[in-house]
Amino acid sequence: INEGTRIRDKLRDGVENALRILGTAFIAHPGSSELRARIDSGALDSQQFYRQLLRLIYRFLFLMVAEERKLIVPEATAGGTSHTVYSRYYSVEQLRRRADKYFHGDDSTDLWQGLRQTFRLFRDDEVASSMGLSALNGELFGENACRDLEGAHCRNNELLRAIRELSVFRTDKGVPSRVNYAGLDVEDLGSVYEGLLEFHPVLRSSPPSFDLVTGSERKQTGSYYTPPDLVHELINSALVPVIEDRVSKAKDKEEKEKALLGLRVCDPASGSGHFMLAAARRIARELSIVREGESEPTPTVYREALRDVIRSCIYA
């Protein structure tokens, strides 16, 4: 547990550093005049700018997790042309490999332009299908999520610095170690989110820069992270009785499946999504048991059940 806590703390530090690097990189680039004009006019305030940066960081985190778990390209086509093209030219992993090398002084912006195309893969059905992928149709990769940032410029060296902050941490002995994103869970990303609630974004114009300072944003906005123990209790007290009631009233396998997929779990202020994912997992476990008829369903059946539950039952 202590080791996991240290890794989460290191990741949170890396996210904070990446936010500062990218925030300053975008507004300071000579080609980002439109972004600076929107900030100077008040059309884009510090909180709105910060939210776009957060979405960008969580795009990176999402893709790093998905790529390491080999979830981007369907298993049936893994190793094929689509997999090779995505891995070589569109993945965040190829940026992580670049960031492991010397990159200082690279003032080009082609890597950021390439990332914009990567983001299109996950929001545009036509573009995604051309690569054998599926668009996510979610807000994280939506056109408005990072609109001002996608229209701005970022130098390669600064982008790679930020990617390295997200990719590598130093152990207590000072040894560089790669973050194992395949092993991260929502609790880890939630811990990062919790730490970010403490900060207030600051934009400076001369010279253009972005910073995070400790503030009272959490108290003022009512933003709070739900700890794992409380999530566990909420699931057991509020959701499990409903699941058991629905299943007990169903007469056969088909009715049980329909009853479970008919559940609706809503959290308008889902934040990191910790509670919602825990709810989805609990319903999915019951659904996979119903489908397979075994108390310990296979991973494949569980994953399919989880996908169906998230599509049908979860609203956030």
Predicted regions, residues:
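Preference for the N-terminal adenyl/adenosyl cofactor-binding alpha/beta module
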Residues: 1-284, 313
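Conserved AAA+ ATPase "SRH/arginine-finger" region at the nucleotide-binding site
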Residues: 316
